[in-house]
Curated annotation (Swiss-Prot):
Summary of the function given for this chain in its UniProt record: Catalyzes the ATP-dependent ligation of glycine to the 3'-end of its cognate tRNA, via the formation of an aminoacyl-adenylate intermediate (Gly-AMP). Also produces diadenosine tetraphosphate (Ap4A), a universal pleiotropic signaling molecule needed for cell regulation pathways, by direct condensation of 2 ATPs. Thereby, may play a special role in Ap4A homeostasis.
Taxon lineage: Eukaryota, Fungi, Fungi incertae sedis, Microsporidia, Unikaryonidae
Organism: Encephalitozoon cuniculi (strain GB-M1)
GO biological process, one term: mitochondrial glycyl-tRNA aminoacylation
GO MF term (any one): protein dimerization activity
This protein's GO CC annotations: mitochondrion
Protein family according to the UniProt entry: Belongs to the class-II aminoacyl-tRNA synthetase family.
EC number(s) given by UniProt: 6.1.1.14, 2.7.7.-
Protein name: Glycine--tRNA ligase
Amino acid sequence: MRKFDQQQIEQILKKRFFITQSAYIYGGVSGLYDLGPPGLSIKTNILSLWRKHFVLEEDMLEIETTTMLPHDVLKASGHVDKFCDILVFDEVSGDCFRADHLVGDALEKMSPTEEISKELQKVDCMSCQEIDEIISKYNIRSTLGNKLSKSQQFNLMFGTQIGYKGGQTMFLRPETAQGQFLNFKKLCEYNNDKLPFASASIGKAYRNEISPRSGLLRVREFDQAEIEHFVLTDEKDHPKFSTVQGIKLKLMHHDASEEITLKEAIERGIVCNETMGYYIGRTALFLIELGIDRELLRFRQHKKDEMAHYAKGCWDAEIYTSYGWIECVGIADRACYDLSCHEDGSKVDLRCKRRLAEPKEIEEWVLKLDKKEWGAKLRDRFSVLMETVNGLSQKYIEKNVVSIGENRNRLSVKFDEYTINIECSRVKKKVFVENVIPDVIEPSFGIGRILYALIEHSFYLREDSRPVFRFKPAIAPVQCAIGYLIHFDEFNEHILNIKRFLTDNGLVVHVNERSCSIGRKYSSCDELGIPFFITFDPDFLKDRMVTIRERDSMQQIRVDVEKCPSIVLEYIRGQSRWN
């Protein structure tokens, strides 16, 4: 397996301001980082390719939603009760530790046995009781050698209060997905009630890590790019699966680890449906196009005790780095769990219409609100009441309706300061469509992790030990640098023209005016991963020619200054190959 010089890479990242610890002048904050110009530029380019590869290619509906969510939303989604890690305390110093990390590290230091190997495989999924038993069994101590407390659950969400009086409990969102589920009804209407369709969202998510570590891999604030593909349970074939079915990938599944095509994975039932297989294939193509080493990429199927009870299947795209195999993308078939939870929690009907092959007769509740009475009482608020009543789900009505006599039923609804009693009755009718809650297949991308893995995979040392990042031109923080051997005023206008042409075409261009040798200028740009360097030299004054140097081969060509910008643009866009 390839080795990475983690220390040297992280040294360069800090020296060249790819990344720095947040508030470093005050000593920094664990688990929070700021991106400098090159780091942010690479992240922007990753997201640009992600949008092109997924959102534009698949006609996804991209939305932006708030980073703060009310308690009720996250209670319904299960995050208030279940978004937890297990922690333990040093009984002497009071230091706290994430239990699975502490136990895992301790077991790895012990003499390997079959039993310890089995414990390591399930440490991520252990309950508090199982953690306590392992700590006792192997006499695991804190990093200071002290006895550990009993383990306990720790909710990972950041909570706050909003408003002058702090009356409403809010949380920083633990994932971008919830905003998409909350807007499902509007997204469905926007898409003319047609299924399947996919929405997408890019933004910050937050996780109050017990013990952040591994740089960008485990942080308290991170960027996510998430897709929610809404599809009917029995219609998970994908019309474009044939475009990825021949891709061979390393799949670690329940039975074995093997390299097979996605077509074979579907036929053998290893991957549960074509839509899931399609997103696995598209994810692999995206990561490889970014510059991730194909040999250091695998897809691992979640173990049954690792997967949520409602999930029908879950795969992680894992990338090998100096920290080992790290999960960078999760692709899960979440069934109809999320929308069902929010329908129950909000009391709003989140079903969509599905045309039936044959009409059928159904019974449903019909509400009869006294519009005259409540219109007079509520005036401007009456339209809001009507929207609330019309949005009530059949499931909610069925659960809360009360019989008040023979063939008479009543539903009580709280609205503002009123309790409104609404008569309701069961009505039979013939329908040509049915209301269903779709399933969701969710590819979730951890952008910070992908960024770090890409940085490691792009790093190498030349024979003279000079460091280089071999970022692809479309991903590099700066696509082209311009410099000179000796400065002459005659260069200025041409440098400006080249820079303007390239920046007008969406490229990032850096003019290197350092007073140092051209070799040092090249090395400085190699450390940033800049693929092309245009050099003006004294001969330009005679022949109007400049030199283009390519980063990885270090080869140079001389071209006419007027043709130079378009030649560089072709190389960067991949329309011409350097040879």
